[in-house]
């Protein structure tokens, strides 16, 4: 078994090191004879440990179990009270504790003062500014570090250097914490006033960040960066990350391009050996120098020195260090401000009368025209989505907060809840549901606020609007997005594109006579100056659209949308400030509407067009591309002469002047070789991503359990690793050990083994090998998967009670009746299931399900129930296929150049051999004809799981299904009788399998699965015409080959002789595959 189990047993003896501690391994086997021995072994272990005897003789006697069975879990118990952390910590606390500089930050509470100085009493105290918001504690983190240090104290050579670096950094952390004592957390992993009052307020979150950083140190440079960030972030809780990462926006403009990848007409990346010189006016260097000076003023020494040294020759080879600094800067943790400061931040900008009215006008008109362009076709055709917009809104209503807690009655049960979906049901039941009236958000009904915290930026506020706003906007926004899907300007939404294509778009037009203008407009989006022109542009567009249709339902939809904009022009917000709730007039645009992303993109596109039209008055150029991506926009301009320093400087100053005419406080830069935006940056013709996901601090508390968070932690670690920030894997595994353990009683704990946590069951948390998703096919693996499936679906009494109440039933019936032309069980049941699933976000339901799952898990981890599940998983399919494959060695040369320098070597190698993928593989079934047919006549969107079920029904049932959703009987009949239907069967099966195999997640999303280089390693003689079987055989072969290459850096070729007789069996099985949802899959989804 793998490394995990080894670390697990070592960790247990490290933590529970007293005389009374006992660890009992529990084994299982799918072989019934061996299974009996496993049970005996366990019984005897428990017996011996009760008598206080050594377990060693049993390990000898049951050697067969230990050698041949599979470890299921380790039962550990220990009676000593758990102050072991403090005792161990003292040994590392040999240094001088840090002293916080109490004047480092402008806002008083952002200084790392002793808690009782910031909060006089427990009533005043809040942990919201420093809450790590993760279900693991500082003491566990300290334990994990000390465990690593102890394990590696005898390392030699280079490994010893890493040990010394980490030890040195940990000494700083340990000494500082030891001075005040380790803060004890409560059962919810929060730190209360009593614990914190005599300690620095930010101690915990700082220590978590520091541990995350020091466990990511490998090289000497890492050490210097980490040391500086650890020491300074103890005092500077506000601007450190921003200071350190600011220079990047200029650095990308300094490296010559010598060979790059460009997007060609076929939307593929293709190598181009062009050379583009970086042309940098002196003014830019002055700005950069100023940034570096600001870093020095803040006490940074080594990081500015590294940047300064790199500036000597600006080489691409050494740029990885710059990229590393940029990523590291985010790991100082989140900047969490009080809501009042976050809100007032936007309101501080003063109004200036001296603005260019003409530009504002042009901006508004561009927004208006874009809105019209986006919605013209659906409005003129009286699109059914716009006619049934209310129903569409209800069907996709989220279960997020509606801004206030209400008392709701479901049958005999009375509940307090803030959830939108529950409010809607309650309102409908009591005749209070009036989607035709958009409630005002003025001084009488101010908007409650949510928050968004990000490292390196100020806290931003989020409107929590009443659900009527969502219903009013949903359908229209969906239409806007589907327009954006096939409009290249909208980089974020453009159909199936990804970051790599956007990268090739920029580099494609860079040459000696072009420059690229890139602007971060996040300040503008939330500024007061944007509000009026922005909302007015939308309103004017909607007015024009209303005149294009005579359908009263479409007009009503547009009018309600318009009403949301009118209401929001006069918005007030409520902000808790101490014990008072302040009402403040808020004249800016905030996130929280359904339209936020779409509308911001439209506005940012209008903004850059306005600017370019002004620049065009003075220079002659062709705009090669304009792109907007979230808060950033960029454009490539091609001139008719070669670009000179003077030109760059002039254009740069003119652009800035034009923005200032609109009072837009934005960061606009001009370069000839690279750009830097929030999502990615291009330097030296290569693409980079910021590896800035925090591991040991979270932005906010959700309702995920420890298992979920362990999976999220692992998933974050993987994303960072792909982007060039690697944390020690042993440390991550230690955290998983801690976070997945289950307490039985105070002194008794159960630790699941690697097999439990990596088999794709409902409990999967991580992969035994980074980047490789394994689907176990051995007897023991399939056995344990079956066992877990038997306890996967947990019931919740509360949910059942709500679902059986009249209120809930009436709501589901209302939806079904509005949606369906004729009764249809599949759809009605689908709606009921979806609505019931939404109840999961109501904490009591979630907790109830979780408790049931944990207790079932406890039973299972102590003795797996042999359970003959009749469900078929993807593992069963792969298990059937596997024996027919024959492996032989093969050879693939490296033939593509690197374009993403931060990738780990093994992943980089695979891409260099088979090429990269620039598109998302369709795994939702939305490309199938049946899906298109349904969306043509109905607002209902079946999931891939539902399509998979439906398409395998009898033809008549499919026809009924379609007709009930409003598809005309003629069309439904034609569909079922045509060839398209059989193509769909294949398409949907393909999508479903891709979805199950997570082909669009992790590093698989980077590989070109249709690479001819990969195809030629696979030989499968063609027998009979079952495309689905051919597909699964090929896909299996590709995954096997790629996984082998990631693991071994070498290639194999596969030959498969699949018997014709087996094919039809396999094909039948393929229509009964059950999808498994686990913390692991939700974590993948969470990355999205």
Swiss-Prot record:
Gene Ontology MF, one: nucleotide binding
Keywords: Magnesium, Nucleotide-binding, Nucleotidyltransferase, RNA-binding, RNA-directed RNA polymerase, Transferase, Viral RNA replication, Virion
Cofactor(s) this protein requires: Mg(2+)
Classification via Gene3D superfamilies: 1.10.357.80, 1.20.120.1390, 3.30.230.140, 3.30.70.2480, Viral RNA-directed RNA polymerase, 4-helical domain (1.10.10.1990)
Xref: PROSITE patterns: RDRP_DSRNA_REO
Occurrences of domain RdRp catalytic (ranges): 501-687
Keyword RNA-binding: yes
Chief place of localization: virion
Catalytic activity: RNA(n) + a ribonucleoside 5'-triphosphate = RNA(n+1) + diphosphate
Cited function: RNA-directed RNA polymerase that is involved in both transcription and genome replication. Together with VP3 capping enzyme, forms an enzyme complex positioned near the channels situated at each of the five-fold vertices of the core. Following infection, the outermost layer of the virus is lost, leaving a double-layered particle (DLP) made up of the core and VP6 shell. VP1 then catalyzes the transcription of fully conservative plus-strand genomic RNAs that are extruded through the DLP's channels into the cytoplasm where they function as mRNAs for translation of viral proteins.
Similarity comment text for this entry: Belongs to the reoviridae RNA-directed RNA polymerase family.
Subunit structure: Interacts with VP3 (Potential). Interacts with VP2; this interaction activates VP1. Interacts with NSP5; this interaction is probably necessary for the formation of functional virus factories. Interacts with NSP2; this interaction is weak.
Protein name per Swiss-Prot or TrEMBL: RNA-directed RNA polymerase
Organism: Rotavirus A (strain RVA/Human/United States/Wa/1974/G1P1A[8]) (RV-A)
């Amino acid at each position: 078994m793998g490394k995990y189990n080894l670390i697990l047993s070592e960790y247990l003896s490290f933590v529970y090191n007293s005389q009374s501690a006992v660890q009992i391994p529990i084994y299982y086997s799918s072989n019934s004879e061996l299974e009996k021995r496993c049970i005996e072994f366990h019984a005897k272990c428990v017996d011996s440990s009760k008598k206080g005897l050594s377990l060693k003789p049993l390990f000898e006697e049951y050697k067969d179990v230990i050698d041949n069975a599979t470890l299921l879990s380790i039962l550990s118990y220990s009676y000593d009270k758990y102050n072991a952390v403090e005792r161990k910590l003292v040994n590392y606390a040999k240094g001088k504790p840090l002293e916080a500089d109490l004047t480092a930050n402008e806002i008083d509470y952002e200084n790392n003062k002793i808690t009782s100085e910031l909060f006089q009493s427990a009533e005043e105290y809040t942990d919201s500014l420093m809450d790590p918001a993760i279900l693991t504690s500082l003491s566990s983190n300290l334990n994990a570090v000390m465990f690593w240090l102890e394990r590696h104290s005898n390392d030699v050579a280079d490994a010893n250097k890493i040990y010394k670096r980490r030890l040195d950094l940990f000494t700083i952390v340990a000494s500082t914490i030891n001075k005040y004592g380790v803060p004890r957390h409560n059962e919810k992993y929060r730190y209360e006033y009593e614990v914190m009052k005599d300690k620095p307020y930010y101690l915990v979150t700082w220590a978590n960040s520091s541990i995350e950083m020091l466990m990511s140190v490998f090289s000497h440079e890492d050490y210097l960066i980490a040391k500086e960030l650890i020491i300074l972030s103890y005092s500077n809780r506000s601007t450190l990350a921003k200071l350190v990462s600011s220079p990047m926006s200029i650095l990308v403009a300094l490296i010559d391009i010598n060979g790059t990848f460009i997007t060609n007409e076929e939307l593929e990346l293709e190598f181009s050996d062009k050379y583009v010189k970086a042309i940098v006016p002196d003014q830019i260097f002055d700005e950069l120098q100023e940034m570096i000076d600001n870093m020095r003023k803040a006490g940074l020494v080594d990081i500015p020195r590294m940047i300064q040294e790199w500036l000597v020759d600006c080489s691409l080879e050494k740029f990885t260090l710059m990229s590393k600094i940029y990523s590291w800067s985010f790991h100082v943790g989140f900047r969490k401000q009080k809501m009042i400061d976050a809100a007032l931040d936007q309101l501080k900008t003063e109004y200036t009368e001296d603005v260019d009215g003409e530009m504002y006008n042009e901006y508004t008109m561009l927004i208006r025209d874009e809105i019209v362009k986006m919605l013209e076709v659906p409005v003129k055709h009286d699109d059914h989505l716009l006619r049934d917009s209310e129903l569409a809104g209800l069907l996709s209503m989220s279960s997020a907060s509606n801004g206030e807690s209400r008392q709701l009655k479901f049958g005999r049960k009375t509940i307090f809840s803030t959830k939108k979906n529950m409010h809607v049901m309650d309102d409908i039941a009591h005749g209070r549901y009036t989607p035709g009236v958009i409630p005002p958000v003025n001084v009488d009904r101010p908007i409650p606020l949510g928050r968004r915290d990000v490292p390196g930026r100020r806290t931003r506020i989020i409107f929590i609007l009443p659900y009527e706003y969502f219903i009013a906007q949903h359908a229209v926004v969906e239409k806007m997005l589907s327009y954006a899907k096939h409009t290249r300007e909208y980089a974020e939404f453009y159909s199936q594109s990804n970051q790599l294509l956007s990268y090739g778009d920029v580099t494609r037009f860079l040459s000696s006579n072009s420059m690229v203008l890139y602007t971060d407009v996040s300040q503008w989006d939330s500024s007061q100056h944007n509000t009026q022109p922005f909302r007015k542009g939308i309103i004017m567009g909607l007015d024009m659209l209303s005149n294009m249709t005579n359908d009263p339902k479409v007009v009503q939809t547009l009018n309600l949308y318009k009403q949301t904009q009118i209401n929001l022009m006069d918005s007030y917000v409520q902000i808790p400030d101490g014990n008072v709730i302040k009402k403040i007039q808020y004249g800016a645009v905030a996130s929280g509407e359904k339209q936020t992303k779409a509308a911001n993109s439209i506005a940012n596109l209008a903004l850059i067009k306005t600017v370019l039209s002004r620049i065009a008055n003075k220079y002659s150029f062709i705009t090669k591309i304009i792109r907007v991506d979230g808060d950033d926009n960029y454009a490539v301009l091609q001139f008719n002469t070669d670009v000179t320093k003077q030109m760059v400087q002039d254009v740069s100053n003119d652009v800035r002047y034009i923005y200032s005419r609109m009072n837009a406080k934005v960061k606009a830069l001009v370069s000839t070789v690279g750009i830097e935006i929030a999502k990615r940056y291009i330097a030296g013709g290569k693409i980079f991503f910021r590896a800035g996901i925090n591991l040991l601090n979270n932005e906010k508390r959700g309702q995920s359990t420890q298992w979920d968070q362990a999976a999220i932690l692992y998933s974050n670690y993987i994303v960072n690793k792909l982007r060039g920030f690697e944390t020690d894997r042993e440390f991550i595994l230690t955290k998983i050990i801690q976070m997945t353990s289950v307490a039985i009683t105070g002194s008794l704990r159960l630790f699941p083994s690697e097999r439990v946590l990596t088999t794709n069951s409902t409990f999967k948390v991580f992969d035994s090998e980074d980047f490789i998703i394994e689907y176990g096919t051995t007897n023991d693996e399939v056995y344990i998967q079956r066992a877990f499936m038997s306890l996967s679906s947990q019931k919740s009494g509360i949910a059942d009670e709500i679902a059986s109440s009249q209120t809930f039933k009436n709501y589901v019936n209302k939806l079904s009746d509005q949606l369906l032309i004729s009764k249809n069980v599949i759809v009605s049941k689908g709606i009921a299931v979806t609505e019931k699933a939404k109840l999961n976000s109501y904490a009591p339901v979630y907790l109830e399900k979780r408790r049931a799952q944990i207790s079932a898990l406890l039973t299972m981890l102590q003795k797996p129930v042999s359970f003959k599940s009749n469900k078929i998983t993807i593992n069963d399919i792969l298990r059937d296929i596997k024996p027919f494959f024959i492996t032989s060695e093969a050879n693939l040369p490296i033939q593509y150049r690197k374009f993403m320098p931060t990738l780990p070597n093994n992943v980089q190698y695979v891409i260099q051999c088979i090429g990269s993928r620039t598109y998302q593989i369709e795994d939702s079934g939305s490309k199938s004809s049946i899906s298109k047919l349904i969306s043509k006549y109905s607002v209902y969107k079946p999931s891939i799981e539902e399509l998979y079920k439906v398409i395998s029904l009898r033809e008549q049932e499919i026809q009924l299904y379609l007709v009930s959703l409003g598809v005309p009987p003629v069309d439904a009949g034609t569909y079922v009788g045509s060839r398209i239907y059989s193509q769909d069967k294949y398409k949907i099966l393909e999508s479903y399998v891709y979805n199950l195999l997570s082909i669009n997640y992790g590093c698989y999303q980077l590989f070109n699965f249709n690479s001819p280089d990969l195809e030629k390693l696979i030989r499968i003689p063609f027998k009979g015409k079952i495309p689905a079987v051919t597909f699964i055989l090929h896909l299996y072969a590709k995954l096997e080959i790629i996984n082998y290459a990631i693991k071994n850096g070498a290639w194999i070729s596969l030959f498969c002789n699949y018997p014709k007789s087996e094919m039809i069996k396999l094909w039948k099985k393929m229509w009964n595959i059950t999808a498994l949802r686990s913390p692991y899959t939700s974590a993948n989804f969470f990355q999205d």
